[in-house]
Each structure stands twice: as C-alpha cells, then as structure tokens.
Amino acid sequence: MMRQPLTKRPRRSGIIAGPNQHKALFRRCGLPVANRASVGALLMTETNQAEQAPVSRRSAKEWVLVLANYREPSTFRSVFELAATLVPFVMLWGLAWASLSISYWLAFAIALLNGVFLVRIFVIQHDCGHASYFSSRTAQDWVGRCLGVLTLTPYDVWRRTHSIHHSHHGNLDQRGIGDVLTLTVEEYRARSRVGRFLYRMYRNPVVLFVLGPSYLFILQNRLPFGLMNKGWRYWTSAMGTNAVIAIGVGLMIWLGGWMPLLLIYLPTSVIAATIGVWLFYVQHQFEETHWSKTEDWQLHEAALEGSSHYVLPQPLRWFTANIGIHHVHHLYSRIPFYRLPEVLRDNADLAQAQRLTIWESFQSVKLHLWDEKLQKLMSFREARRLYGRV
C-alpha cells in the first residue's frame, strides 16, 4: 500500500502522512475507507472554505531532510540546561531534608514538587540515549549513566529497549518492547475470558498510572527485561546502576534514618515515574494514532502519524523538556530537546500536526483497542457496540 504525502488533518487542522489519519473524515462523511479520491476532494473543499494556507505536500520521509538541519547540539546550551535542572533538584532535595525537622508534610510536599525536576532529568537522559545531547558520544553516555541512577533507569538497557521502540513503533507484528501493550479488536475477541480480563486490568487507569509506574521504575528496571540473554553489557548496566542506588539509599538511611527514604526519595521517584508514564501514554495512545501490519508499515509515516504533539502551557513544556513535541522527535530523534521549538517555529505545518490538547489527552484514557478496519483506537464500549460481545 502506497502512502500519500502530508496533508491536513480534518479534526485538528494539522498535517498527516498518509490515509491512516483520514478516518475521522471518512466516518463523518459516511465514505468507505478505500474511497480516497472522494476524501481528497472533500478535504480540498473544506480547506478552501476555511481559507486555510496551502497544504504541504511533503511526505514524512521528505520531512526528515528538513529536520536534519536541527540536529547539531550546542555544548554550552546542553551544559546550561543540565545545570538548570540539577541545581534546583539538589536544592529542593536539601530543603526537603531540612524540612523534616519542621514538618513531615512540608518535606513530603517539597518532594512531590521535586518530582517534576526529576522528569526533566529523565528527558535529558533520554536525549543522551539518542546521541543528541552532546557532540561527544562518550560524554553523553556517561552523563546518561549518572542520570540513570537518579531516575532508577539503567542507561544502556533503556537506550537499547527505547531504540527498539523507535524502530518498531506502530508495527502490529513487532509489539512487546518499550511500548504500552495494545491489542486489536480481533486479538482481544480471540482471547480466553481470563485473557480478556487480564487485558482489561492492564488497561485500567489505576494499573497504568498508579501501580504501573512504581512497578516499572522501582522493580522492573532492576533487571534487563527484554535483554536478559543479549550479553553482559545490559547486565552490567542494570547491576551497576543497582549498586550505586543501593549505596546511595544506604547512606541516606545511615545519615537520616528512614524518613528521608519514605518521605522524600520515594515520593519524588514515584511522582516522576507517574508523570513519565502518563507522557509516554498520551504520546502514542490517541484515537487517530497509527498501527499497521509489516507489509503496510513504513518507518517515517508510522513515526509521524503514530506520535502526538502534546500541547502544553509554557511552564509544563519547560519541566517536560519539550517531550510533548513527540511527532517531531520520533521522525528525527537526533534533535536535542531545546531545539524542538525551533522546528515548530520554522515549520507551521509541523506546528499544527498531530495536536493533542490536555483535555483530549484525558479522553484517550478511555481508548483500549485498535480497530484495523476503521483504523482508529477505540474503547471497549465502542467495540462492543460495533462488533457485539467483547
């Protein structure tokens, strides 16, 4: 199946990379999925009526050539952003510790606030894993490993599994590592009653956003899951990170007892993990995302169509280090996070593409199954309405 160049998204007035994103307009107009000519004519009519700018005809692959112009990091800027994140993080840690002698609740509140700085630390580690943060690979690998101790994430393990996520995202035949488990309607219906129950439990918001983040970062990250038989490098990364974490926690308890661990360290880590999992979820789990079989899957189209542009107010963009500009990041992961706004500034089509508001992101929690026929993510309720018992 040949995919079309970028065109306007009917619902959010952005751009897309292929027919996958026309589904909302297909359904609204009662057109069959295969009738692309009618949809193209309708899109042109709506565009003219709205007096919008001409549609970009760049394909997703052509956008890669444009984005390559933004890949060079600035060493000064990278060091500055790292310092602007670590210094407040350390200061708030110290303030929370000092507050233990005044009020446990005050220390706990400061620890929760510090969680947003830990999110930013994780995104910097994330950029190091993509080799986008410094010109020196050695420098960014060691910065990433050190930050991984703070984020409870073994750097080399995460770098590899995240690379797999980027390489296979949106491919229905390559699920399982570095993504949120997503079943198709047919796969879900084919499962046993126990299997369906377990999937419903997994997709429950309490499991995904309350229990899951703590399990992932505090427990699962202690072993190189997914890479257990892939060599010593990943075991060294996991065990080395664990050893440094254990030394740090031991010193913390020795110096201050259990309260710093229970009221500062764990709350900061848990709130950061929760925010991180939420961000990852909304970056790929939205109604008009992209999934396809290997024979129809194309890397660049899947990157652009299957990743959202999470529209956040400026303070949240800073704390999350622009990770919400995820459609651009997935299309060209070598761009440092602080240069992503430049991309949107210079390319209005990308600025309007794949937009997901905060309100829309809350609605995405209700979506559970991928419908291969309608090419959209849907809720259990909608699947039941369309296909009977699920």
Label every PLM stretch briefly:
Residues 134-135, 146:
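Small-residue-rich helix-interface/hinge motifs
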Residues 121-130, 158-170, 279-288, 319-335:
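Histidine-centered catalytic micro-motifs
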Residues 87-91, 117-121, 271-274, 320, ...:
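Residue-level signal for transmembrane alpha-helical positions in Major Facilitator Superfamily
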Residues 108, 257-295:
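Juxtamembrane/interface helices at transmembrane-helix boundaries
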